[in-house]
């Protein structure tokens, strides 16, 4: 089995080393194509306005000056010699990719790009108690459980238009309680903040920050599982259509385009 590895934390990230150790439990036919620089939060961004440069580290390991999506596309169309991969693994991300964060995640995007090429793709993330708290990161949890989970997923299979999003809880392996197949959750509080700073010349600048807030996610969600020490396995697909709203709106917007009648209309609550 040929496996392509990528990530969004960059070619030197410790999580990529963990991913390689997971992959080599499954196969010795491994290709690694990862960003030269960190691309956390890049989502499905493409490099369109600059050339994409590639550094070959060894015959099957490349660093790409681009996003995770660029990396997978480059691997598929320019870098991998011989047969296409049978599997794309993206990660292991430094921090969880849960709930609405999956739309921001370069790790998830790498898996989506693999799926777009018709390859079975899995995103893997290691949750942390605090953002980028690598001192106490439990990489051993992902490495301990990752091979078995990937193997079982391959045995079970999943639809071609679906990726699998795996999140390991921020605990040591012996503290993991079980694996749960979950749905994508949604946080009940906003956790990002834009923090204002001032440089030595008196000019303002801003950092994106994260605020730890109490949360009570719904049962059956990826959030709840990881918060309670379980490994979350979530099938995701790229179709973002909300079918219930489609059905509800058809009566109001179907047919002849509506005409603007008067200003100041109140919106529906």
From Swiss-Prot:
Cofactor binding annotation: Binds 1 divalent metal cation per subunit.
Cofactors: a divalent metal cation
SUPFAM superfamilies: SurE-like (SSF64167)
Keyword hit for Endoplasmic reticulum: no
InterPro entries (UniProt xref): SurE, SurE-like_Pase/nucleotidase, SurE-like_sf
GO CC annotations on file: cytoplasm
Record key words, sorted: Cytoplasm, Hydrolase, Metal-binding, Nucleotide-binding
Reactions mediated catalytically: a ribonucleoside 5'-phosphate + H2O = a ribonucleoside + phosphate
Primary location: cytoplasm
Pfam families given in the database record: SurE
Annotated binding of a divalent metal cation, by residue: 8-9, 40, 93
Enzyme class: hydrolase
Enzyme nomenclature, EC number: 3.1.3.5
Subcellular location: Cytoplasm
NCBIfam families, alphabetized: PRK00346.1-4, surE
Family in the record: Belongs to the SurE nucleotidase family.
General function of this protein: Nucleotidase that shows phosphatase activity on nucleoside 5'-monophosphates.
PANTHER family documented for this protein: 5'-NUCLEOTIDASE SURE (PTHR30457), 5'_3'-NUCLEOTIDASE SURE (PTHR30457:SF12)
Protein name, entry field: 5'-nucleotidase SurE
The encoding gene: surE
């Amino acid at each position: 089995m040929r496996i392509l590895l990528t990530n969004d934390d960059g070619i030197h990230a410790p999580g990529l080393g963990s991913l390689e150790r997971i992959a080599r439990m499954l196969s010795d036919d491994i290709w690694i194509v990862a960003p030269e620089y960190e691309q956390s939060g890049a989502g499905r961004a493409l490099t369109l306005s600059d050339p994409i440069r590639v550094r070959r580290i060894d015959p099957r390991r490349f660093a790409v000056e681009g996003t995770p999506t660029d990396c997978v596309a480059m691997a598929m169309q320019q870098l991998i010699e011989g047969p296409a991969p049978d599997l794309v693994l993206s990660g292991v991300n430094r921090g969880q990719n849960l709930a609405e964060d999956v739309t921001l995640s370069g790790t998830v995007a790498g898996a989506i790009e693999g799926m777009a090429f018709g390859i079975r793709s899995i995103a893997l993330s290691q949750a942390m108690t605090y953002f980028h708290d690598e001192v106490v990161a439990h990489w051993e949890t992902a490495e301990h459980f990752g091979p078995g989970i990937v193997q079982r997923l391959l045995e079970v299979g999943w639809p071609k238009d679906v990726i699998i999003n795996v999140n390991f809880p921020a605990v040591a392996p012996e503290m993991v309680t079980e694996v749960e197949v979950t749905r994508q959750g949604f946080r009940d509080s906003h956790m990002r903040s834009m923090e204002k700073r001032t440089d030595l010349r008196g000019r303002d600048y801003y950092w994106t920050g994260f605020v730890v807030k109490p949360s009570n996610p719904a049962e059956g969600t990826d959030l709840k599982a990881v918060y309670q020490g379980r490994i979350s396995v979530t099938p995701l697909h790229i179709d973002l259509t909300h079918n219930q709203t489609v059905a509800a709106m058809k009566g109001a917007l179907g047919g002849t385009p509506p005409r603007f009648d008067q200003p100041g209309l109140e919106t529906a609550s």
